[in-house]
Every structure is written in structure tokens, then in C-alpha cells.
């Protein structure tokens, strides 16, 4: 019986440091995204987005984000792809919920087609936004990530303003 108590005490003591290390080494997410591309009439697109991030410490990480969206308003097929990279700043204090903000830069591929005719462009894109990682249940390794981003892209000397709203599953990998 004494041996069992010593084993239980040792397990509890070894578990304390591992519980305190809550910063994942990396994150991967995939989910649904709604993209509103503004312009003279505006276009609503639905799609999927995903990201992979490396967390250098508990507040700073580098993220790559990819999204593919499609819609057919006005009988015209629109497809947009965003691919951006940059820093993410997270706040991991006193809560299981981890809010974050990010500033990403990259490209925006946009194509439209109707009746066998099509056009496309590939302008510079930038994205500023944020969200929060909310654990699902008692498992800190899988969570839900609601996110809101402003996406701008430069084409022909002007900036088009867009908004993306996403809900994704996030998977926390390893520990820092």
C-alpha cells in the first residue's frame, strides 16, 4: 500500500510540470470560410481555409494560411484563392481560451468564367485579423477556432477590401 502511495505521489509531481506547459509547438486548422469580395456589386464566396503555424514561444508564432472559395452570382463562376504568410501574436494567460491577432502578406488569385470565356488576376494581398482557439471539452489538443479577417488586395493601382469569416477545427501539435 505504501508503494502505491509513493507511485501515486510521484505521478502527481511529474504531471505538474507537464500541465504547466500549455503552449503547443505547432497548430494546424481546417474549416469553413465565407469571403465577401467587395467591389461595385460585391461577391459572396464560400469555401475552405486552413493554416499551419509554428509557435516560437507562448506569444509569437509564424503562420501560413491558404483559402479556396467559390461562388456563382449573376451566372458567373468566381473562384478565389488566398495564400498568405506572417506573424501571429497569441495571449495564453489565465484562461483555456487563446485569443490571437495576425498580420499576413502574400497573394490573391481571382478567376471568373462564363459561357466558355474567362479572366483571372493574381494581385498582392494582405490580411489583418484575429480570432480565438477554444478547446473542445477537456481535450486541449483539439479546439474550435472562430476567426475574422480583413483582406485587401492591390490590383491596377487600387485596393479592394474584403472580409473573411471562418470557423475551423484546430489541432495543437506537440508542446513548447
Model segments located where?
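Gram-negative (and chloroplast) outer-membrane scaffold detector with strong preference
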Residues: 51-146, 150, 166
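Enrichment for repetitive, rod-forming helical segments
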Residues: 9-13, 95, 148, 152-154, ...
